[in-house]
Amino acid sequence: PGDLRNCLVALADTEPLMEKLFQHRFEGSSELSGHSFGNLFIAAMTQVTGDVETALKESSKVLAVKGQVLPASKEFVRLDAIMEDGTVVCGESHIPEAHKRIHRVKLYPEHAEAVQSSLDAIRNAEAIVLGPGSLYTSVIPNLLVEGIGDAICRSKAVKIYICNVMTQPGETDGYTASMHVKAIMDHAGRNAVDY
């Protein structure tokens, strides 16, 4: 839920203390150590409301979010990477730790169903902005959810990719901006990015 947390915080019309609270990571040696309060909040809200889409709607009310934060899918998936040397790395957090060049990423299970409200938002968009964010562990995984990449490619909206200003260690070492765009197109299709 880290990407969702960051989107909620970015669009929230709340006190700076609330932003600091949502980004706070617990320290020490307890079971909470390393976990972010915001991720735990979203996980708890998901359990209370029954699904992540409703959890985001309710969290948006709590945080006075301006705009909408929509999940690509309600399903829990694992992100795997096929490296250029053919090895497979399972799990998002392990991918940058492999220190190998990524060939492709994929979701497991492969056929995660898209949330209809997300598909509707793509269909009705005037502009679609991808990024910034970790190319292989944040931007591209959303495009792999069944129907999302295709909906973006078919959209008449202008499609803009905003590249990170810094290299994502273990993911995009040595990448140029055009290599970022090529990776997106290789995963989602040639019409996924206009600019």
Segment roles from a protein language model:
Residues 135-146:
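Glycine/threonine-rich flexible loop motifs
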Residues 162-164:
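Generic beta-sheet signal
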Residues 174-195:
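C-terminal functional extensions of proteins
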Residues 135-137, 166-169:
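Short, catalytically relevant binding-site loops at active-site mouths
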Residues 123-124, 154, 192:
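Alpha-helix C-terminal capping/helix-to-coil transition sites in glycosyltransferase folds
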Residues 155-159:
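A short helix->loop->beta-strand "cap" motif at the edges of active sites that frequently abuts
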Residues 1-100:
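Electropositive, gly/pro-rich neighborhoods at or near active sites that engage anionic ligands
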Residues 75-134:
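Active-site gating loop/helix substructures
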